[in-house]
Amino acid sequence: YTGSYTPDQYNNSRTSGNYQTSNVDKYIDNQMRNITLQYHSGFGLDIGGDYTYYTSNNAKRLYADYQDGSQSSFSMVGGQKIDRYSIYADQKQSLSKGWNLGYGISYRFAKDLDFQTYDKVTGNIQTQNTYSNLREQTTNFYVSLSKNYTTGTSLSVSATGEYYTIGNYHKWAVYPQASLTYFKTPKHVFQLSLSTDKTYPSYWDMQSSVSYLNGYTELWGTPNLKPMTNYNLNGS
């Protein structure tokens, strides 16, 4: 079990330039809890799961004076809540002639809720109340095969099948992995590998909110972000 709680965080930002002078006060409370359970058998079976709970509540006040004499201000309250569950089962076993087999399955479900509500808005500044409730599911199946030879040569291949959904987006994909190490002499070793790396966007990046850093700079969330996949082939 791990947990953290950081209440009453305060940040003040003052910006002065040719176009505007602004002041932003921001208050944040963050809380995170994680529980992990694992079981390791004596015959190659591993089972586990975890649950993560995260909340972030924030409030912001902005006041800006512009060069043309106009003014803008607002108060905003917002928050983010994440519930994430995951389970997995892995099995490893030895085959004949020195081969090793592995296979398993994993499932992850995450729910990300975030909102922003504006009040006391004055001046020519565009504000919009937002609410987002994302649901993400990832199911993986994998199988691997490997062997180490007495000569020092080793070989391993694996493939992971994934079904990923978030909102109305659904995707099936297969991610291969392979590596070969050929040992001829201590000074002559040949290596070849194929790897697949998948990067998931953070839940913070997928928020639907708009954040004002000052009177003219805005940060927009990107709720339609999707995972990115990289394939790498290396030899030496």
Please state what every model-predicted region is.
Residues Y1-S236:
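Primarily recognizes Gram-negative and organellar outer-membrane beta-barrels
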